[in-house]
C-alpha cells in the first residue's frame, strides 16, 4: 500500500515554525560581544537570502518555481508506504506508515535544502559552496545541487565516515565536488585537531569549523549547512506537507517519529503536524530518536553553546553535550553532532517532543529486520526511527491500542553496507558516555 502524489501537489510554500513556537526563540549570540548577532555579519558566511529566511517570522515562505521544478526532477513528491509486513510480523494492532525520502536521486532528504541553498547562492553570484558532511548524505546532495546550478562544491567529511563509507566520497566526486577527510591539513583548525590526535575520527562539529574557516579565506565562497539552523529545517518541511496530503488517503497519525542528529529530517516530517498541536487543532505524540553515543537531547544541557568545535559560529541556545565533546565513531555518521536545532530544543524543553536514545547494535538489528520484511535497506540514521517505531508498535500490542504510527525513513543505506557487515559479523561496538551531563559547555573542564 502506497500513495504517490502527482507533481502538481509538490508544496508551493515552506512552513516556518518560528512564529508558532510556544516561546520566542533565543537569538544567536555574537561570540565576541555576547549580544545578538548582527545579520550583516552572517552574510559573510551564508547567502543573503538564507540569512533573511533564518531571521524571518513569516509563517510561510514561497518556494521558487525553479526549485519546485528541480524537486520534481530529483524525485519529489516521495512515496508514502504502509509497512504491512512489519505489522504482521509484530502481530500488532498498530498501523505503521513511512515517508520514504530514500527515493530521491541522492538517496535521502538532504537534497530538499541543498537545491534551495544552491539556487539562492547562484542568484547572488556565489561561485563556490563549502560544507561539512557526516555520513555523506548531505555532502552528496550539495554536490549534485552545485552541479545542477554550476557552482563549485568543497566537502569536509568526518574522517570516521570518510573511511567507513568510501563510495560516498566517490559519488560526491562523480557530481564534481572536492572531498577531504576532516580534520584535514587544509585548515588551521584541522591541523590543531590532528596535532592532538593524528588518527582523529573527526565529527560534524570539526567539519563545520573547517568549512567556515575555508569560506572566510575566499570572498566568492559561502558556507552551506545541512541541518540545525531554521532555514534548513524550513526547507525540509516539504516532507511533512506532502505526508499530510498522503495520509489523507489513509488516516490521521497518532504518533510521528524521526531520528535526530541536528534535527532537519525530524523537523521536515514533524513540524507541519506540530503546527496543528500548537494551534490547538489536534493532538499527536512526537518522538525524536538519537544515538546513545551522542545523547544531546536525553543527557545534554539546554544552554548556549557554539555550533562547531572550532568556535567560529555564533552561540546557539540548544540541547548540547558541549562543542568539545568527542563523538564516538558510530556508523550513523549523520547523528554524530554535539547539539541539536534550537527550534527543536524549544519543543523538547516544552514537552511537545519526547526524546529517546538507542545503542547502535539494537538499531542495526531493527534495520536488518525491516530490510527483510519491507525490502528497503535503511540508512543507519533512519534506522533509529525504525527501532522506535517497532518499540511503539509492541507497546500498542501490549496495551491493546489501535494506534497509527508515521515515521520518516530519511534515506537508504545502500552505501552504508560496511556497518551492516559489522553487525552481521558481531563486530559492532556500543558507546555510551559516562561523564554526562556537563555543567558548562562553554567552559568544560579539561
Curated annotation (Swiss-Prot):
Write down what this protein is called: Tryptophan synthase beta chain 2
Keywords assigned: Amino-acid biosynthesis, Aromatic amino acid biosynthesis, Lyase, Pyridoxal phosphate, Tryptophan biosynthesis
Task: Specify the species.
Answer: Pyrococcus furiosus (strain ATCC 43587 / DSM 3638 / JCM 8422 / Vc1)
The biological pathway it contributes to is: Amino-acid biosynthesis; L-tryptophan biosynthesis; L-tryptophan from chorismate: step 5/5
GO terms, molecular function: L-serine hydro-lyase (adding indole, L-tryptophan-forming) activity; pyridoxal phosphate binding; tryptophan synthase activity
Q: Which domain of life is it from?
A: Archaea
Entry's family note: Belongs to the TrpB family.
GO CC: one term? cytoplasm
Q: What is its EC number?
A: 4.2.1.20
Query: What's the top EC group for this one?
Result: lyase
Residues found modified as N6-(pyridoxal phosphate)lysine: 110
